């Protein structure tokens, strides 16, 4: 199953992305969906904060109930991906650390802000 949706860039974008992910119910395992929602929310939040102008695109390709690839694409200039270990007392900046920790693989397409992660359990 493929999910592809444009999400308006505004403070409610993470919630809109989580609602869109509900379309995966029944095709993706119930214990995988919460992690997908969390990681997509973190990436969408980063895109809203740093991703330039225009809509955001969320694409998810579910290859089975426990295997999927999610991508968040925006109009930003790109960045060097760094997921740092964070002190437990830090309030913010956990997004890429969570992506690194909860996904099997993740990365950024060079030259754009096109962040992806894969879950394969």
Language-model segment annotations:
Residues 15-41:
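Conserved short strand/loop->alpha-helix "switch" segment adjacent to the catalytic nucleotide/phosphoryl-transfer site
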Residues 2-18:
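STAS-typified acidic loop motif
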Residues 41-42, 48:
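Active-site rim helix/loop that mediates acceptor-substrate recognition in acyltransferases
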Residues 1-4, 47-121:
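Conserved beta-strand-loop-beta-strand hairpin that lines the nucleotide-binding pocket
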